[in-house]
Amino acid sequence: MITIVDYDCGNVNAIINAFKELGVNAEVSKSINDIDNASKLILPGVGSYDYAMKRLFKSGLIDSLNNSVLKKKIPILGICVGMQILGNKSDEG
């Protein structure tokens, strides 16, 4: 299942609507279990790098995302600031 990670910092509705238009099944989730069991992940984001990182850490999903992507090699697509936070650091505030 494609899982769109909801960490309260993204354009989740736009993404799910695009998948519906394409006839692709995807779920929106804040659940560690769903992230751990996803076949692919989408990490949306709107706003600044710092704000997105704060929301991601506050969500409690960072360890699950790291495990899924870095250890299990689950493909991830970052959109907008969701792509930026896949990096180690940013000069953006």
Residue ranges of predicted features:
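Residues at the C-terminal ends
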Residues: 21, 37, 70-71
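Structural signature of beta-strand start/N-cap positions in the alpha/beta core
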Residues: 25, 40, 75-77
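N-terminal beta1-alpha1 ligand-phosphate binding loop
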Residues: 2-24
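Cysteine-nucleophile active-site neighborhood
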Residues: 47-93
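Short gly/ser/thr-rich secondary-structure transition/capping motifs
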Residues: 21-28, 59-60
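Short acidic/histidine-rich motifs immediately flanking catalytic phosphotransfer sites
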Residues: 35-45
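Short alpha-helical
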Residues: 10, 33, 47
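Short acidic low-complexity segments
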Residues: 26-37
